[in-house]
């Protein structure tokens, strides 16, 4: 979601921990202020070819989803790199410990590099990630021997969040906790506060009379409970505004509208590596058939929840506005939190670079349905070429969508936050 004002290009490309986009980003794209209503946008500074990586970016802060971690989707506590081998990953998703994957040498997981925090035993994929976490936020958030103590303030906060926010998950209270911890540990606290302030944090779009779906009257009690637990666990005088009722709502809106989903999978990495193998035709057909059947079996056992999942705040990516016909997309091909923004078509210098905030299925729904999702989650009504072309369509969903929405609207809200 594009922020409201200011220039983040220098900050996003700077040397501060977690803020380094690839140097190529400086040449390929830059953030520009568009209007007070739309905020910033990302624009090409040169011609970009289809399939080209516009930039690669680390998040300012990121965190694995709490239910995802609880269900043993093992990921690095800092960069979210999947920690299971591809075979272990497939065995768990299938519920079949006897499964053996062919071509095990194509698995890129290096267990010999994994390290744990000596105090709380959270696991990292490398010494570099353990050190990066320690230097940025983990000194504040390390639970030490209290990791399994349900009365510890941080554990109470996480349990309350899990009881309000069931899968499919879209954010985590720990993303907010890591923001606070980052500022508390920082030598230059004002710099980090300013960096976080670059993200859009409005709780409502007054011009269009839209409020974020998780900040309505229905959820006032849950938000106040979270705020009190958040304050007990993390209060800091220099960040006192974040702990007030309105400040907490703004912080909540910030991670809700700017948080970029992150997905990693050692199995997916193994599949991509196998796809690149130069094999005789018969062996290629056998391997492809094995992989196809493997995914069918996993879908029956585990459904759609295949990846280690979390979310992060990305300075440059957050400047990308939405389009229902995007010219770029985000992905995580390195099996960690490094975000690649890749062109879906040729983009000319001066052209705005847009991604879609909707998934593929949502983009195929009616204009009314698409904008319902965008208003509730991102506080705007889309005016992309596709939406303008469908402007005269009835402001109702199709019969099929109407029936589905009637059955799922309340359930979706309950999935997001349930009464406690």
UniProtKB/Swiss-Prot annotation:
The keyword Mitochondrion does not apply. GO terms for cellular component: cytoplasm. S-adenosyl-L-methionine binds at residue 357. Residues 392-420 are annotated as: Disordered. GO terms for biological process: methylation; negative regulation of gene expression, epigenetic; positive regulation of cytoplasmic translational elongation; regulation of stem cell differentiation; regulation of stem cell division. Its main location: cytoplasm. A zinc finger (MYND-type) spans 104-142. It catalyses: L-lysyl-[protein] + 3 S-adenosyl-L-methionine = N(6),N(6),N(6)-trimethyl-L-lysyl-[protein] + 3 S-adenosyl-L-homocysteine + 3 H(+); L-lysyl(20)-[histone H4] + 3 S-adenosyl-L-methionine = N(6),N(6),N(6)-trimethyl-L-lysyl(20)-[histone H4] + 3 S-adenosyl-L-homocysteine + 3 H(+); L-lysyl(36)-[histone H3] + 3 S-adenosyl-L-methionine = N(6),N(6),N(6)-trimethyl-L-lysyl(36)-[histone H3] + 3 S-adenosyl-L-homocysteine + 3 H(+). Gene3D superfamilies: 1.10.220.160, 6.10.140.2220, SET domain. Protein-lysine N-trimethyltransferase that specifically catalyzes trimethylation of 'Lys-22' of the RPL40/eL40 subunit of the 60S ribosome, thereby promoting translation elongation and protein synthesis. May also act as a histone methyltransferase in the context of histone octamers, but not on nucleosome substrates: trimethylates 'Lys-36' of histone H3 and 'Lys-20' of histone H4 to form H3K36me3 and H4K20me3, respectively. The histone methyltransferase activity, which is independent of its SET domain, is however unsure in vivo. This is Protein-lysine N-trimethyltransferase SMYD5. The gene is SMYD5.
């Amino acid at each position: 979601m594009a922020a409201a004002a200011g220039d983040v290009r220098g900050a996003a490309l700077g040397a501060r921990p977690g803020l380094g986009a690839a140097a190529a980003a400086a040449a390929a794209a830059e953030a520009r202020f568009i209007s007070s209503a739309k905020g910033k946008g990302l624009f090409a500074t040169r011609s970009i070819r289809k399939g080209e990586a516009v930039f690669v970016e680390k998040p300012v802060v990121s965190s694995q989803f709490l239910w995802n971690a609880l269900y043993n989707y093992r990921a690095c506590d800092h960069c979210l790199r999947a920690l299971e081998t591809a075979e272990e990953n497939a065995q768990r998703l299938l519920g079949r410990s006897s499964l053996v994957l062919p071509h095990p040498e194509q698995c890129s997981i290096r267990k010999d590099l994994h390290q744990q925090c000596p105090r709380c035993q959270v696991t990292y994929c490398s010494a570099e990630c353990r050190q990066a976490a320690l230097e940025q936020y983990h000194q504040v958030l390390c639970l030490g021997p209290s990791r399994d103590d349900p009365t510890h303030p941080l554990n109470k906060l996480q349990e309350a969040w899990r009881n309000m926010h069931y899968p499919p998950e879209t954010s985590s209270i720990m993303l907010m906790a890591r923001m606070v911890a980052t500022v508390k540990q920082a030598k230059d606290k004002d710099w980090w506060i300013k960096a976080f302030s670059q993200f859009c944090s409005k709780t409502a779009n007054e011009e269009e009379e839209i409020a974020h779906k998780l900040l309505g009257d229905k959820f006032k009690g849950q938000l106040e409970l979270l705020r009190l637990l958040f304050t007990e666990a993390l209060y800091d005088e220099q960040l006192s505004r974040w702990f007030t009722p309105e400040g907490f709502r703004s912080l909540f809106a910030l991670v809700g509208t700017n948080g970029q989903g992150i997905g990693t999978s050692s199995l997916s990495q193994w599949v991509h590596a196998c796809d690149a193998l130069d094999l005789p035709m018969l062996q290629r057909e056998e391997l492809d058939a094995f992989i196809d059947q493997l995914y069918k079996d996993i879908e029956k056992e585990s459904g759609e929840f295949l990846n280690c999942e979390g979310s992060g705040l990305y300075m440059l990516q957050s400047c990308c506005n939405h389009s229902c016909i995007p010219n770029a997309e985000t992905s995580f091909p390195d099996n960690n939190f490094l975000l690649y923004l890749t062109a879906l078509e040729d983009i000319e210098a001066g052209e705005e670079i847009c991604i879609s905030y909707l998934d593929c299925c949502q983009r195929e729904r009616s204009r009314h349905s698409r904008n319902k999702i965008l208003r509730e989650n991102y506080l705007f009504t889309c005016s992309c070429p596709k939406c303008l072309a469908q402007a005269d369509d009835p402001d109702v969903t199709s019969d099929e969508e109407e029936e589905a929405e009637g059955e799922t609207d309340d359930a979706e809200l309950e999935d997001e936050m349930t009464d406690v």
